[in-house]
Curated annotation (Swiss-Prot):
Its EC number is 2.3.2.6. The gene is aat. Belongs to the L/F-transferase family. This is Leucyl/phenylalanyl-tRNA--protein transferase. GO terms for molecular function: leucyl-tRNA--protein transferase activity. It is found in: Cytoplasm. GO terms for cellular component: cytoplasm. PANTHER family: LEUCYL/PHENYLALANYL-TRNA--PROTEIN TRANSFERASE, LEUCYL_PHENYLALANYL-TRNA--PROTEIN TRANSFERASE. GO terms for biological process: protein catabolic process. The lineage of its organism: Bacteria, Pseudomonadati, Pseudomonadota, Gammaproteobacteria, Chromatiales. Keywords: Acyltransferase, Cytoplasm, Transferase. The keyword Acyltransferase applies. It catalyses: N-terminal L-lysyl-[protein] + L-leucyl-tRNA(Leu) = N-terminal L-leucyl-L-lysyl-[protein] + tRNA(Leu) + H(+); N-terminal L-arginyl-[protein] + L-leucyl-tRNA(Leu) = N-terminal L-leucyl-L-arginyl-[protein] + tRNA(Leu) + H(+); L-phenylalanyl-tRNA(Phe) + an N-terminal L-alpha-aminoacyl-[protein] = an N-terminal L-phenylalanyl-L-alpha-aminoacyl-[protein] + tRNA(Phe). Its main location: cytoplasm.
């Protein structure tokens, strides 16, 4: 019988149990407690583990099976999204307003009872941003209003998406497309989305087993690390990059492993 592992909140370097020991129900719950220090968070991400909990709960650590991922540069860009990206409806930026993005992601939504991005979580990722490990993508309209964004953590050749928001149609999709294209150009090997959703699957995300994800993560972690702040390349064309890959018929098992 599996026993839930309790982490020492006074020792951020105390080890996590192997991700393979996560519970089946609830899917992926691995450990409780600890802290949200940069040392602890980096250790978690390197092991395929992330924090996710609500107000009034202790810190909960997860590694679900299966895992939802993209291969950078292989998102599905619809014709409608391609038109939005090429007409100049949005202005995109990287690492320009991290606090604005995470605050918008934490705001209550109509389809949710509450938010899991509690204040201590926000402060923890803002600390990672100051260290150049966490990053944000911003989507601005023509009036200069922040209308979409996402944030996540980058270690070596792996990017771990945490949350995104959209106040205009296609704004969060634009963030995904631009970030995926830039990660592809930089040679990133893995874009982790944690848990699958219909929205992510429509954009080309796939579910892989936890064991496959952990193997791909270890391969990505040997690649060079790119510390922030990041900026988009001036000549980046996300539509061209993704369309180039969409014209190929590469099977998912070739892209992501069987």
């Amino acid at each position: 019988m599996y026993r839930l592992y309790w982490l020492d909140e006074h020792n951020p370097r105390s080890p996590f149990p192997p991700a393979e020991q996560a519970m089946d129900e609830p899917n992926g719950l691995l450990a409780v407690g600890g802290d949200l220090s940069p040392v602890r968070l980096e250790q978690a991400y390197r092991r395929g583990i992330f924090p996710w909990y609500g107000p009034g709960q202790p810190i909960l650590w997860w590694s679900p099976d299966p895992r939802c991922i993209f291969r950078p540069g292989w998102l599905h860009v619809s014709r409608r999204l391609a038109r939005r990206l090429r007409t100049g409806a949005f202005r995109m930026s990287l690492d320009t307003d991290f606090t604005g993005v995470i605050s918008a992601c934490a705001a209550p939504r109509e389809d949710q009872a509450g938010t899991w991005i509690v204040p201590e979580m926000m402060h923890a990722y803002e600390a990672l941003f100051e260290l150049g490990i966490a990053h944000s993508v911003e989507c601005w309209d023509r009036d200069g209003e922040l209308v979409g964004g996402l944030y996540g953590v980058a270690l070596s050749g792996a990017f771990f998406g945490e949350s995104m928001f959209s106040r205009r149609s296609d704004a969060s999709k634009a963030c995904m497309a631009w970030l995926s294209a830039q990660l592809h150009r930089w040679g990133f090997a893995l874009f982790d989305c944690q848990v699958s959703s219909p929205h992510l699957r429509r954009m080309g995300a796939v579910d892989v087993s936890r064991s496959r994800f952990l193997a791909q993560l270890q391969q990505a972690l040997v690649l060079p690390h790119r510390r922030g702040p990041w900026r988009f390349d001036r000549d980046l064309d996300p539509v061209a990059i993704h369309r180039q890959h969409q014209t190929r018929t590469t099977a998912p098992e070739v892209l992501y492993g069987s």
